[in-house]
Amino acid sequence: MKTLVLENYFKEHPEYYERMVAAYIIGFSVTKDDLEANPHLKFATGESDTGVIISWNTEGPKNIEENASNAVVRTNAISINLLNWKLDDTYAPASENLGSLVLNEETDETEISDIGADAQIVPERGVIVTNADYEPMTGMDDVFGTQSFHNGDYTLYYNNIKDNVAKRIAAYVESQ
């Protein structure tokens, strides 16, 4: 879908791309090679730029230490830090996380909670690493590695994503 819309359709219809607030490609890699092959596309460089792609993949320290194979992490991947909106390895503590969406096992309802979801980009891998108190995907180690949080790419940073969508929409409206 990313290829179909961003790379092909927007290339042929720049008038639609110009009206795009942002494309959140969550949990799937966007690479430097993708951007070089499609110069009409821009990756986000901050928290309120518009007409950009926002992408990340979240892993735990074990995947980094083991250099684990992960089906959604491609060579030359780029991620943006959801807590400080930087592309480098500047650490963002969990105190910058506005809240994770988790299941309360007692009520069987989802709720916003602090689970210690910090974030730091690992530039050479193109992922976010977190020390969150969160269960990694299980039963798919051969596909995602032993500590993939592919299942938490949204939920770990849920309120930061909501806040960011509002900021980007406001920036877009202001620019019109």
Positions of PLM-derived features:
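Glycine-rich nucleophile elbow surrounding the catalytic serine of serine-hydrolase chemistry
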Residues: 1-4
